Amino acid sequence: MRDELIRIVECYLDGLKNKDLSKVAFASDVTFEGPLSPKLTGERAVVEFLTGLFPAVKDVRVKQHIVEGEYVATLFDFDTTFGVIPVFDCFRVSNGTLKQIRPFYDPRPITNPQESSEGHV
């Protein structure tokens, strides 16, 4: 069970990295809620939003997965045109599909690139 949940999450992360979400098993009512977006509901809305990120994506490097029940928390480095952004993503996997995606990260490299490059905290 644990390995299957991780496989589903890694398919999503590989999809971001390779700029191709066609193999990702999204639930039809998947939700995505991040620091810079309102809560999105439905596969079409989520895929549309994520596809908009593709031009900024350079790499995704997974550091760790933590699995409990149907939840997977994944720590990864999101290498983007804004720099490397450490992300802690909380996923809910239900019936073999991604049901919830909730990323947590510091948005300053995106919202204020000058400030983050100067090292202000």
Predicted segments, located by residue:
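C-terminal and inter-domain tail/linker signature
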Residues: 1-121
